[in-house]
Amino acid sequence: MTSSIRPLLAGNWKMNGTSESLRELRAIASGIDSDRDRCFEALVCVPATLLSRASDILSDENIFLGGQDCHFNDSGPHTGDISACMLKEAGASHVILGHSERRTDYRESDAIVCAKVKAAWRAGLVALICIGETLEERENNTVLDVLAQQLKGSVPAGAMDHNTVIAYEPRWAIGTGKTPTSEDIAQVHGFIRKEVSHRFGDEGHKIRLLYGGSVKPSNASELLETSHVNGALIGGASLKATDFLTICNIYRKL
């Protein structure tokens, strides 16, 4: 962790959850105290269908609400898409962009991610930008080159700590139960910090860097104590209040 940066624990529900799942969100909200938990911030990114109701649940809570993607246009003939403005109106303050599943399933390029980030900023949303290498790229020892290109292509000029969060999520670790070693994560996060600091100056020193990829209660302590890690992007473990709150409790003790 970087002690001067307030960490962020971000849950990503992905394409999971119905109205019944909001019970878990209520439990998460009940388990996070705004006075006690000033040592970190919490964010839950739910499916778009749940945003409005989730916003009602979290309206008086110390938890941020996020979307999972947005279009790069503010409106128009884009059937099935959702704009950043719509997310904002539904109660979101953040949006995940460039997630590995979007990059893989929909062939989203760095340029598309960059355009979406700009749309998020226009709407007043914080962009949580994901970058990460494939297993092949890791085996070919091109991880840092890949990440440098993704940072350059996906993060627009104007990134600041109040409008940008960057999550390192190695694609091969998403949903597999596998994670890099803490040494590998520290190396990568140190590299990312160097890159954003060089490009954005003082703001680059303050942008939060999250780790994402099979984060769960059993490995959270080791991951969150790793150098240059300012929080986590949590997938499956954010669907159950007990798991998410266990990770929050681990953070309280660090």
From Swiss-Prot:
Record-listed substrate binding positions: 12-14, 175, 214, 235-236
UniProt keyword Cytoplasm, yes or no: yes
Full protein name: Triosephosphate isomerase
GO molecular function terms listed in the Swiss-Prot or TrEMBL record: triose-phosphate isomerase activity
EC number: 5.3.1.1
Catalytic activity reported: D-glyceraldehyde 3-phosphate = dihydroxyacetone phosphate
GO cellular component, one term: cytosol
Catalytic site: 99 (electrophile), 169 (proton acceptor)
InterPro entries the record matches: Aldolase_TIM (IPR013785), TIM_sf (IPR035990), TrioseP_Isoase_bac/euk (IPR022896), Triosephosphate_isomerase (IPR000652)
GO biological process: gluconeogenesis; glyceraldehyde-3-phosphate biosynthetic process; glycerol catabolic process; glycolytic process
Pathway this chain belongs to: Carbohydrate biosynthesis; gluconeogenesis; Carbohydrate degradation; glycolysis; D-glyceraldehyde 3-phosphate from glycerone phosphate: step 1/1
Physiological role: Involved in the gluconeogenesis. Catalyzes stereospecifically the conversion of dihydroxyacetone phosphate (DHAP) to D-glyceraldehyde-3-phosphate (G3P).
Cellular compartment(s): Cytoplasm
Keywords, alphabetical: Cytoplasm, Gluconeogenesis, Glycolysis, Isomerase
Similarity comment: family membership: Belongs to the triosephosphate isomerase family.
Complexes and interactors: Homodimer.
